[in-house]
Curated annotation (Swiss-Prot):
The organism's place on the tree of life at top rank: Bacteria
Pathway(s) where this gene product acts: Lipid metabolism; malonyl-CoA biosynthesis; malonyl-CoA from acetyl-CoA: step 1/1
Residue ranges of every copy of the CoA carboxyltransferase N-terminal domain listed in the record: 4-264
GO CC annotations, alphabetized: acetyl-CoA carboxylase complex
Taxon lineage: Bacteria, Bacillati, Bacillota, Clostridia, Eubacteriales
Annotated organism of origin: Heliobacterium modesticaldum (strain ATCC 51547 / Ice1)
Location(s) in or outside the cell: Cytoplasm
Record family assignment: Belongs to the AccD/PCCB family.
Listed name of the protein: Acetyl-coenzyme A carboxylase carboxyl transferase subunit beta
A Pfam short name: Zn_ribbon_ACC
Function: Component of the acetyl coenzyme A carboxylase (ACC) complex. Biotin carboxylase (BC) catalyzes the carboxylation of biotin on its carrier protein (BCCP) and then the CO(2) group is transferred by the transcarboxylase to acetyl-CoA to form malonyl-CoA.
GO biological process: fatty acid biosynthetic process; malonyl-CoA biosynthetic process
GO terms, molecular function: acetyl-CoA carboxylase activity; ATP binding; carboxyl- or carbamoyltransferase activity; zinc ion binding
Subunit structure: Acetyl-CoA carboxylase is a heterohexamer composed of biotin carboxyl carrier protein (AccB), biotin carboxylase (AccC) and two subunits each of ACCase subunit alpha (AccA) and ACCase subunit beta (AccD).
Amino acid sequence: MDGLWVKCKQCQQILLTKELEKNLKVCRCGYHFRMTAQERIVMLVDENSFIEWDRELVSKDPLQFPGYAQKIQKCQIETSMSEAITTGQGRICDIPVVLGVMDPRFIMASMGAVVGEKIVRAAERALKLRLPLVLFSASGGARMQEGVLSLMQMARTSAALTRLSKAGLPFFSVLTDPTTGGVTASFAMLGDLIIAEPGALIGFTGPRVIEQTIRQKLPEGFQRSEFLQKHGMVDIIIERPKMREQLAALLALHCGNSLEGVES
């Protein structure tokens, strides 16, 4: 977050950036600003417990899409990430987990071949290690610059999570602002427990497109996490300052048997 001050989009108050960051980027009015993947990992996992996987995987621009290679390179420099998701193993309140966190700064965390591959590998390692999988989604959907290779990741990630489910290992999906498009239509909505942050935009396509298509005015708060929880699409909404402790409690509740005998 650049600058000394930042304006809240909800209450319009001017906030001191350092104070906002101390409060995990949550305004006094409850508005949740977007976080980077690194900020979220630091917030969640026990100190020095996170080991990143597959950082060497990078997109090779398979379709030679104009400007795509330059955009990838620019995002890598600006974010210090190799791709739009960081995956690895860590501990949350001493509970071992496989963790994946998307970062919307990287081409809006769109899902291409590398993002899909990293999620599949994370699920496969969770299966091998007998650990729960936790994925934090924040995405604009499938990455158009990779065409059908991007769309394939919807099926690949879903298949990997099905194998995890058949093995009796839990997958917690945490939806943050925004979670849309092909990510919503695939792995993000397949969690054994679907968690969301307050006020997160969650849907397949944008509300303006829907209104233009059906020629009707959408209900207030449509596609926000509170609306989805009310209509059975989200199981629980957790405020960011409470995320670590409540996630640990839910993991302990759901993972007691599956974690027996796991080496830390």
